[in-house]
Structures are given as structure tokens and as C-alpha cells.
């Protein structure tokens, strides 16, 4: 018998929300139950729960701590956690864009470790943040030097036209 059937038979309501403090290799969620006339209350509880959930997000350029676009993260409730390096599988480029920005691409053969900042981005703010990202940047999995996998900025290959490689520097500087 599934949860939905149990709720209906018992005259209850329920809402499922994702939970990200467990092992991130498998999806995990929590179901909040209440009496059928309490839907508004469990929606409020779910909303509060989601506001406390966050995902680690890696940035290598203009969104780094103290850089010009950091406010795009902090205004959405993101908080700086740490400065770390990626695993040695990335190449970094100074893109030919206005404004100029870095582009990081995965390359397990000629890559190097790149300096990134990790922010905790509230789950409820992810959509608003994604709406601000412009091509050729994209979001993907970024492997850190300690083996963690986090979401972060990457660059699509076509964005490297006329770009200057700065992998040997190991970080982006304004």
C-alpha cells in the first residue's frame, strides 16, 4: 500500500519534501502528514523546511567572495562556506565576453586543480539563481580535491572560442 492510499484511507493529507543531509548518492525525502483539514499548516511546515535546506555550490569567478557578483548569491540567502580546490581535472579560461568572466571545463587528461569558493545556496533560491545564468556558462557536477561532488559553474565548449587559457594560474583574478 502506498503512502497516498494510507493518507486517503485515514482521512489525512501529506506532502513530500527533499532532504539533503543524508548520503547524497541516493535521493532521499521526508513526508509530512496531518489531518485532512490541516493542508495549509503542512504546506507552511514544508516551506519552512525547504528554506533551511541548502546545496553546496562552487564558483570560480565573478561570484567568488569579494568579487563583483557575489551579491547575486548573498541576496538569495547563500552563505560563503570555504575556499577549496577542484580535483586536478579542470581547465580554466578567460572568456571573450562582456563582462569578462572565467569558464571552467572538465578535462581529465590535461586538467589541473582550480581555486573555487563554496557557497551554501538555499534550495528555495536555486530556481531564481539559475534564471540569472547566461550562456556559455552552465551548471554541472564539480569534483573537489577531497572527492566531494558539488554543483557549480562550468562552461560549454563553444564558449572557448577566442578565450585565453589561464589554467596554469589556477584561479581567476579580476
Name each region found by the language model.
Residues 4-55, 93-97, 123-126, 136-138, ...:
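Glycine-rich, small-residue loops and helix-cap segments
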Residues 55-65, 69:
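GGW-centered surface loops in extracellular recognition modules
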Residues 69-86:
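Short Gly/aromatic-enriched secondary-structure transition segments
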Residues 78, 93-97, 102, 143-146, ...:
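RNA-binding accessory domains that recognize and position tRNA/RNA substrates
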Residues 84-111, 119:
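Basic, polyanion-binding surface patches
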Residues 104-148:
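Mid-chain, well-packed structural core segment of small domains
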Residues 145-174:
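C-terminal edge-of-domain segments
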Amino acid at each position: 500500500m502506498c503512502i497516498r492510499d494510507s493518507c486517503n484511507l485515514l482521512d489525512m493529507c501529506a506532502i513530500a519534501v527533499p532532504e539533503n543531509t543524508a548520503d547524497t548518492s541516493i535521493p532521499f525525502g521526508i513526508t509530512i502528514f496531518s489531518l485532512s483539514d490541516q493542508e495549509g499548516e503542512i504546506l507552511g511546515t514544508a516551506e519552512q523546511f525547504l528554506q533551511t535546506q541548502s546545496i553546496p555550490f562552487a564558483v570560480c569567478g565573478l561570484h567568488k567572495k569579494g568579487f563583483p557578483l557575489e551579491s547575486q548569491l548573498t541576496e538569495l540567502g547563500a552563505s560563503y562556506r570555504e575556499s577549496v580546490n577542484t580535483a586536478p581535472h579542470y581547465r580554466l579560461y578567460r572568456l571573450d565576453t562582456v563582462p569578462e568572466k572565467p569558464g571552467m571545463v572538465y578535462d581529465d587528461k590535461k586538467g589541473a586543480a582550480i581555486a573555487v569558493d563554496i557557497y551554501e545556496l538555499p534550495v528555495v533560491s536555486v530556481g531564481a539563481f539559475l534564471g540569472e545564468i547566461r550562456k556559455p556558462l552552465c551548471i554541472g557536477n564539480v569534483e573537489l580535491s577531497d572527492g566531494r561532488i558539488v554543483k557549480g559553474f562550468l562552461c560549454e565548449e563553444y564558449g572557448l572560442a577566442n578565450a585565453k587559457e589561464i589554467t596554469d594560474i589556477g584561479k581567476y583574478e579580476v
